[in-house]
Amino acid sequence: MSKEKFERTKPHVNVGTIGHIDHGKTTLTAAITRVLSTKGQASFTDFSDIDKAPEEKERGITIATAHVEYETVNRHYAHVDCPGHADYIKNMITGAAQMDGAILVVAATDGAMPQTREHILLARQVGVPAMVVFLNKCDMVDDDELIELVEMELRELLDDYEFPGDDVPFIHGSALLALENPEDEDKAACIWALMEAIDSYIPEPERDVDQPFLMPVEDVFSISGRGTVATGRVERGIIKVGEEVAIVGVKDTVKTTCTGVEMFRKLLDEGRAGDNIGALLRGVKREDIERGQVLAKPGTITPHTKFKAECYILGKDEGGRHTPFFNGYRPQFYFRTTDVTGVVSLPEGIEMVMPGDNVSVDATLITPIAMDAGLRFAIREGGRTVGAGVISEIIE
């Protein structure tokens, strides 16, 4: 019998803690690294190190985010935790740290609070596929019935936001006790139970290369005697020489054949997610294709002009607008590689949006862009970023 090969290629999953301020998100993050470090599955990261998270820029927006990593027997996890409420909102909207699943932390002493709701709603809008709940501070509640009540309330709340409230795993425990007693079987049990829950309940993300082919067009050249080449970075999937591709967005969708793929002036058989390539397109004129369009597997993406989106508008101190905007606001929406002008309509009852706010809007673009729910964009005025958004629903 041949010896089984050691596999170091565990599936990689991105998770993050969300929930109301002071409910224990950062303590839980520290506790996970502390408890897992007893078995060599993480290196311990101190609460204060997570709390003074470094700032990073994503789509022109500064966000403080702490990253830790750990592994279970089955998976490798990258875990994000944000110090401030505004950082969470910015993070979820810009996708700075894309989450395959979220750990919602709720203090049993408080139950669901305003930010609990806001984070669940955002997770729904930005397309976080699954969530597990860690009921924290259970040691501070004497009455088990109270804890059960909090859990029932939360399951209903999850249902309200279209997460399957009955199926979502709930783990009861105390992050602080686990952090302080990582070797104590009883006190650390909640952390191991949480790991088991995320392992089994959060679905493994489909790898970029397994998704249908898509490449945003960054530049177009014509090569005499060979035809037209579109260059860009393959966002997802694989393009093989000889395959049909659709040119989508801005104009009517056109189908053509990719007759060559080159990278660093070498001819290849295929281009894969992450590669910067030039795709040679049969029978396409230089003026038929432009930046802002995408090459995609035919039938997998369509152009649209109207959509609903969740947006974060930069504050004045972040280099954003100094004044509010109103219904009918006309900024540019920067999708992938290009700016498109659009008109914003605000929800009923909202008169204006102040710098630093987050808001759900309907937007109408003047030219159609290849899009699907989950696509992120920047909101710009004359080349300056004033906000960020993510499409929550396509209208037409």
UniProtKB/Swiss-Prot annotation:
Q: Which UniProt keywords apply?
A: Cytoplasm, Elongation factor, GTP-binding, Hydrolase, Magnesium, Metal-binding, Nucleotide-binding, Protein biosynthesis
For region G3, the annotated ranges are 81-84
Its main subcellular localisation, reduced to a broad class, is cytoplasm
Q: Gene3D superfamilies from the xrefs?
A: P-loop containing nucleotide triphosphate hydrolases, Translation factors
| Residue span of region G1 | 19-26
Show the segment(s) annotated as G2.
Answer: 60-64
Its UniProt entry gives the catalysed reaction(s) as: GTP + H2O = GDP + phosphate + H(+)
Q: Which GO terms describe its molecular function?
A: GTP binding; GTPase activity; translation elongation factor activity
Q: What's one Pfam family the UniProt record gives for this protein? A: GTP_EFTU_D2
Domain tr-type G per the UniProt entry, residue ranges: 10-206
The region called G5 is annotated at 174-176
Tell me which InterPro entries the record gives. EF-Tu_GTP-bd, EF-Tu_GTPase, EFTu-like_2, EFTU_2, G_TR_CS, P-loop_NTPase, Small_GTP-bd, T_Tr_GTP-bd_dom
Binding-site residues, GTP = 19-26, 81-85, 136-139
- What GO CC terms are in its UniProt record? cytosol
Compartments where located: Cytoplasm
Region of interest called G4, as start-end residue ranges on this chain: 136-139
Q: What is its EC number?
A: 3.6.5.3
Amino-acid positions noted as binding Mg(2+) in the UniProt annotation, renumbered to this chain = T26
**Which PANTHER family did the record assign?**
ELONGATION FACTOR TU, MITOCHONDRIAL, ELONGATION FACTOR TU-RELATED
Q: Which NCBIfam families match?
A: EF-Tu (TIGR00485), PRK00049.1 (NF000766), PRK12735.1 (NF009372), PRK12736.1 (NF009373), small_GTP (TIGR00231)
Q: What does this protein do?
A: GTP hydrolase that promotes the GTP-dependent binding of aminoacyl-tRNA to the A-site of ribosomes during protein biosynthesis.
Q: Would you identify the family this protein belongs to, as annotated? A: Belongs to the TRAFAC class translation factor GTPase superfamily. Classic translation factor GTPase family. EF-Tu/EF-1A subfamily.
User: What quaternary arrangement does the UniProt entry report?
Assistant: Monomer.
What's the name of the protein?
A: Elongation factor Tu 2
> What taxonomic classification does the UniProt entry list for its organism?
Bacteria, Pseudomonadati, Thermodesulfobacteriota, Desulfobulbia, Desulfobulbales
